[in-house]
Amino acid sequence: MTTEIRRPISRAASTSRSDAWRFASACSTQDPDEFFSTATKDLADNKALCLSCPVITQCLTATLTQESGRYRFGIHGGLTPAQRLALVWEERLHGHRPNLETAQLLVTPRWRYVLYNLSRLTPEAAARRLGEAGIDTDAVTVRLALWWIGRPGNRLRQRVTRKEPETNRLLRLHTPLIRQLRALGATHQDVAAYFGAPEPLVGRAVARLEKADRAALETTEMEMAA
């Protein structure tokens, strides 16, 4: 059974010139509550509608500018709350924002199939392959384009074998990045969004990492005191 969670909103007409794009949006005639549903079918339908929207980039830019804090709701600019949070941490950690024009190019019929076939690679590896094919791009732009076509776009690469536990693999591949994120004040939710990983998995990884750090510190202090 699918549980639906809706956060009701009211539609308000705006006469602001900066908000004029809203009247051209594909969702302007839709029930706004549907864009705050967590039902799987609603998410897929809403993201598909966003991809056909002529003002998807304006919507995403406005939403990223206006959102702050812990609370993000609904589908905006073709992205879920977690995906938009990931973009926030892409910028904080690497100083990179997606190139919206290039992302739109990547989801056109000419490039969409190519992008889809690269979706099992890391965003960095996919960006390199696209560069070889003639598109100069970066990891965060690739992530955005992958999200728009319904692919994961995760920085945590899909597991090839089940022999290695997920927690071990996350720590083996990404301990330095986890440390950087935590040093910048990232919560478990933030780290999970950045990697595209389940929050419980990130919680276990961070707990193990911090436990190891405490043990190392205690050992160092004991050696210095000896």
Model-derived features with residue positions:
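Short, amphipathic alpha-helical "recognition" segments used to contact nucleic acids or chromatin
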Residues: 103-122, 167-186
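Short Fe-S-cluster ligation motifs
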Residues: 12, 21, 76-102
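Short, non-ligating residues that shape and space the ligands of small metal-coordination modules
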Residues: 59
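Immediate flanking context of iron-sulfur cluster ligation sites
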Residues: 17-54, 65-68
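Short Lys/Arg-enriched helix C-cap and helix-to-coil transition segments
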Residues: 147-170, 180, 210-226
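Short, basic interhelical loop/turn and adjoining N-cap
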Residues: 93, 104, 122-147, 164-166, ...
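Short, charge-enriched, intrinsically disordered boundary segments that mark the beginning
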Residues: 2-25
